[in-house]
Amino acid sequence: LMGGWSNEREISLISGESVFNSLVASKLDVIKLDLNKDNIGKIKGLNPDRIFIVLHGKGGEDGEIQLHLENLGIPYTGSGSESSKVCMNKKTKKKILLENNIRTPSYIKISKSTNIKDIENSFHYPFVVKPTSEGSSIGVYVVEDRMSCKVAINENMKISNDVIVEEYIAGKEYTVGIVNNNALPVIKLIPPGKFYD
């Protein structure tokens, strides 16, 4: 499954084509489906042995397609619907981390009517402005001053009504993949810009 209806549709199509070509090269019988809200019902009729999910963002990484496939009884790659839902929503994820005494940068939810002075009373520059449920760093801004804060808020409100401001933590960035509850080696990320996309 590739494409979808999120802000990351185009990158999903590129990723999906790459995965499709790799699976075909591995001599597997593969069908690709450029998924949209109008053809989601087509999945069941394909009668797949397994679905390789290459959807990004809303609908693809937030548990929506995973729950649909679970309801159809079709196995798929990646995390389950509940963990996908939790991990995609930054507020929900932070709540669970804090409930389990795992440190996470402090944050507040904001709206169009939030006064920037209230944000500045809670955070020192730089800080982060981002939507709660987008992937690939869509809408993520590290703001250095009031003007860049206004821009970040305005741009985020165009794509989401659910936006947070978060404490900026300077430092090195690492990632650890997990497959079947087994942690893979730690990888240091060296982004070309201020943070990894």
Predicted features along the sequence, with ranges:
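Phosphate-binding site of ATP-dependent enzymes
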Residues: 144-197
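ATP-binding N-terminal substructure of ATP-dependent carboxylate-amine bond-forming enzymes
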Residues: 1-88, 92, 99, 111-118
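Basic phosphate/pyrophosphate-binding loop/patch that engages nucleotide-derived ligands
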Residues: 96-104, 155-158
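Structural detector of well-ordered beta-strand residues that form the stable sheet scaffold
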Residues: 77, 105, 128, 164-166, ...
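Short, glycine/acidic-enriched loop or turn micro-motifs at the edges of active sites
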Residues: 37, 109-112, 133, 170
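ATP-grasp fold ATP-binding core
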Residues: 97-98, 122-138, 160-171
